[in-house]
């Protein structure tokens, strides 16, 4: 069986690597984007992305804009992974169609468990 592809979007390379390392251990194929514009490009170039893990605060295009753009054409599961912990930000995420909202700092093991739970329901 082919590995499921996950797109990890964060402007911090260290954060992308941390998340990627935990996902790769669970046999996921991970694509990375360092900003919102790159994320949208990668998403439309790779139609078989199973899930997106998305930061909010990034250069060029923030996570909210990425979510709006992707939701125009896709119901791919999206997990927001962000330092923005205000209730209004979390509610905005759900209004835009995200599936899960996780604030930093976070447990990578819990993140992976949530990824697996969402993918079990969506596939």
Model-identified regions with their sequence ranges:
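Acidic, metal-coordinating helix/loop segments flanking the phosphotransfer/catalytic sites
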Residues: 32-51
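Acidic catalytic/metal-coordinating carboxylates
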Residues: 35-38, 62-65, 89
């Amino acid at each position: 069986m082919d590995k499921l592809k996950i797109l990890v979007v964060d402007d911090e390379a260290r954060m992308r690597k941390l998340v990627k390392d935990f996902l790769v251990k669970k046999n996921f194929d991970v694509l990375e984007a360092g900003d919102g514009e790159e994320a949208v490009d990668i998403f439309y170039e790779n139609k078989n992305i199973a899930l997106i893990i998305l930061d909010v605060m990034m250069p060029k295009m923030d996570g909210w804009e990425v979510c709006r753009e992707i939701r125009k054409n896709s119901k791919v599961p999206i997990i927001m992974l962000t330092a923005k912990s205000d209730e209004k930000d979390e509610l905005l995420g759900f209004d835009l169609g995200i599936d899960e909202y996780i604030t930093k700092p976070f447990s990578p093991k819990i993140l992976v468990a949530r990824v697996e739970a969402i993918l079990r329901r969506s596939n």
